[in-house]
Amino acid sequence: MSEVALTPLDEPALARLLDAAVAGADPLEVMPPVGGPPGWTPERRAAFLEFHRARCLNSATAVERTWVVDVDGEAVGAARLQPDGDAVEAGIWLSRSSRGRGIGARVTALLLAEARSSGAARLLASTTAGNRGARALLEGAGATLIVEGDEVAVELPLS
């Protein structure tokens, strides 16, 4: 069985995360939209780095903790927790080649442990109705899913 680990994001890990995103994800799956032609343009790569620096690495602007998802030492995605009152909002993305292999369930368990150790009372997440993989992971963890049209809101008590 492959070793799955969460590595705290720092500059070297961010470079590995960008490589994983470029190799195995569409930019719209892993970052806010950036104008221009589709694909991983130089501008989109720079925006990816700045997005993560601002949200996690810059102490003046950080709003979340982010980890690189490593499988056998190779970056394959990211996981994050953002404080939201007595809760933490969670997010995970995995490269296409890492989906459907049980990695998401193991990352979810690791992220839940991090959320519990943070002292949060609840874990929140959101996804789309069509994201069957995310929905299955969250339901498997015991979360309540509230579906409204194409939006799915998730809440899971942590105690």
Task: Identify the role of each PLM range.
Residues 1-89, 95-96, 114, 146-158:
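GNAT-family acyltransferases
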Residues 94, 100-117, 132-140:
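Conserved acetyl-CoA-binding loop-helix of GNAT-fold acetyltransferases
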Residues 94, 127, 143:
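Hydrophobic adenine-recognition pocket in adenosine-nucleotide-binding enzymes
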Residues 110, 127, 150-151:
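Proline- and acidic/polar-enriched loop/turn elements at helix boundaries
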Residues 115-127:
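Conserved GNAT acetyl-CoA-binding A-motif
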